């Protein structure tokens, strides 16, 4: 396991441009739009900056779950690294845990960097326990992005996989209210938004950060989406392996 983690650490440094882009682009959007949008009510402005910082943190994390995770899994398949692992003394569970640990590390860096930018450059304020709690809830919500990434990794064609990942990455945050409040959408779009997984990630984290309230409904939605996506990915993988055998 230690050797696998070392390999993942080396691979992370080799792909540093992707790592920087995954964090830098959402942070750039946060700084840009937070400087443009201004409300006459100071409290409303504070709420906007807080919620926008949190949604952009989730947006940053989604890039690692939807792109980095499935691409590293597919790369290991095409380069036969996974085949080597399966025929070695290393357990397949240790292999997947090392991959998950790498993405979780990316998640944590994205959370820390975006939170620091919000605090030092936009004067976002929260009690300490809410900073920690919001980060923990975002990290927990990262399981959703990992599950979707695992499902995307089952797509054989790299071009189609990239297309699907980009659609989910760009469309879901827009529909879910990460960019603009869903109250600005038509009613029929709002009804769709409230069923999307990213909407419930935003609800879970933002409600806790603002009021210290825990949304069990949103947590259940996130867990349900995570279980369904993971189950579907494992089913497709097992079917493919049985057909091959």
Spans of model-derived segments:
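Transmembrane helix boundary and interhelical loop/hinge segments in multi-pass membrane proteins
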Residues: 66-88
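Aromatic- and glycine-rich beta-strand/loop motifs that create alpha-glucan
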Residues: 1-25, 80, 242-244
